[in-house]
Amino acid sequence: MKRTTKTIFIALLILNFFALNAYGLSYDASNHYELENVIIKQMSKYNPDFNIKYTGSLDNIEEVLKNTVDKNIYLKSNISEVHWDLSSTKHVSYINVKVNYIITQEERIEADKKIVEILTDIIEPYMNDHEKAKAVHDYIVLNGKYDENKLYYSDYDLLMEGTSVCNGYALLTYNMLSKLNIPVKLISGTGTGEAHIWNMVKLDDYWFHLDSTWDDPQPDIGTISYSYYMLTEKEITKDHTIDENQDIPKSTKKYYDYLKELSHDKLLAETGLDMYNEENTAKNESDLISILKRKILYHPLRISIRFDKSISQSSLESAMSKLAINDYISQIGYSPIVSDNTGEWNILNLYIKYKETPEKITLDFAKN
């Protein structure tokens, strides 16, 4: 479930002749700052071919041109190729920029329209930013499918085709949250050693890492994971690395702790973070069976439990088989066992399908 990035090819030709034969629109820039602004503005409009009459210094010009794209992750994520041609005389230079985007301007407009329609459907007036962010995350995970063939790269693809690599997941998360005025960033790096991209989201005063791609279980069985939902930097970097030279906000507040402070019991249960509560931590097989029996009474779509590392795989399977005897359950699946954020316990994430959808999915706030 990792992203395959498209390499940005930059061809810089410094040619010593006066005029540049070009077909795109022309803009003026007299210094590096103005040059960057022109490039960013035109790329933000998905302009595929434009010219710049540049009268500033040529010192480090190749680095300036390359870094303009590299340091703007949103632009870089929407581009497949960039070609720069530069010709110069003693006092003026002409730069032609040709760009191949992963979508067209028309597709961007269509995607934005679709995003507004979706948000109108999934966002309620009473929701706070925590609930809005979760609604966006859940929509993307439930309606998206990771593109194993690596043919689709954009949020437009994820919206219209229902599939994309991580670039599309991260872009759709970015664009949906941005329209809700929730601060959000794109973060580039690696996931288990492969090029990857995800998001950071600011909720109230705190920034968190959010990887909607890795929260979409594979194979796609119509379930939602929250294993990479609102993590600290320490938590995300267990299997992600962050590219250098990015403006990364500090992220040290554990989302579980913050939801406890806010008394958001409903969100704790819905995201499975209530597994950190004492009553949802299994010290032995008997505890595990007891917790599962209690939780299944509320017909959840997902059950998350912390359990002692001494509990064997056969004990886990035995406990899960006892759930399967309930005749209203059609399917039980679980994600790979991982350690919790303390490293001292393991986590069991169960995904449950019912033969009939309950009229109302209730949540377990009960205490033993």
Model-predicted segments: where are they?
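N-terminal accessory/pre-domain segments preceding catalytic cores
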Residues: 20-127, 237-368
